[in-house]
Amino acid sequence: MVIRQFDEEFWYKGKCYKIGDRIIGTSESEYEGLFGSIFEIRDGEDKETENDTPDIYCDFEAPDDQEEIKHLEDVFSDLYACPKSLDEICLDIVIMAPEMIRVVQTEAELKGKV
């Protein structure tokens, strides 16, 4: 199953994920704290990964804050065991598992106040 239509819903373990939803990366991923959006969901035989969970395709926004940029560069430098700059970190077409993202519901959450 491939879901691409804006506002189309996909339910997984009692949580609703919709195409176009604003999301934030959780502590379960290298993208923790980054905002983005869902643009595609794949499940079953249409998945690209071998994970037991659906593949949720996200585009993330590059951080503006220099401390956040440095933190992201450090995380990916450690992950790849070589220095990585922001320009070298993939922020679009990132396949995430459901536990790696949280849907952002309110304006306060979008501004990072919750």
PLM segments and residue spans:
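Basic/aromatic-rich interaction segments and small domains that mediate binding to polyanionic partners
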Residues: 2-114
